[in-house]
Amino acid sequence: MAKKVINVVKLQIPAGAATPAPPVGPALGQAGINIVGFTKDFNARTADQKGMIIPVVITVYEDRSFDFVTKTPPAPVLLKQAAGIQKASGEPNKNKVGSVTTAQVKEIAETKMKDLNAASIEAAMRMVEGTARSMGIEVKD
């Protein structure tokens, strides 16, 4: 018989750097999860992606056990890394803060494909290009 789900917690945590300190500790403590066990598992699973923000969905069961699924880093994080910028533009229509090539957009779209609601790589690329535009990043050929 399947275990009964009592809670689902969604967090964005730096890869390989989960600690029991806020915001991770309190969110997991409220759900009744073994915080140290989760942080060790998460850090081991994401050690190869250091420096990236990793979204994670934690499913908590009735017996206080848990499973978690890591997702791909958010598109804005990947775009900022590709463009070599720290912060997106506050006025994306007026101030362009960086640029990415179509090849970089395609690479990001391929990375994000499993988490995006897109039927083709072209549709995923359009989503990533839209995110880039809203951040003040130009897409060049």
Swiss-Prot record:
Pfam families named among the record's database cross-references: Ribosomal_L11 (PF00298), Ribosomal_L11_N (PF03946)
GO CC list: cytosolic large ribosomal subunit
Keywords recorded for this protein, A-Z: Methylation, Ribonucleoprotein, Ribosomal protein, RNA-binding, rRNA-binding
Record SUPFAM superfamilies: Ribosomal L11/L12e N-terminal domain, Ribosomal protein L11, C-terminal domain
One Gene Ontology biological process: translation
UniProt PTM: One or more lysine residues are methylated.
Keyword Thylakoid: no
Superkingdom of source: Bacteria
Job of this protein: Forms part of the ribosomal stalk which helps the ribosome interact with GTP-bound translation factors.
This protein's name: Large ribosomal subunit protein uL11
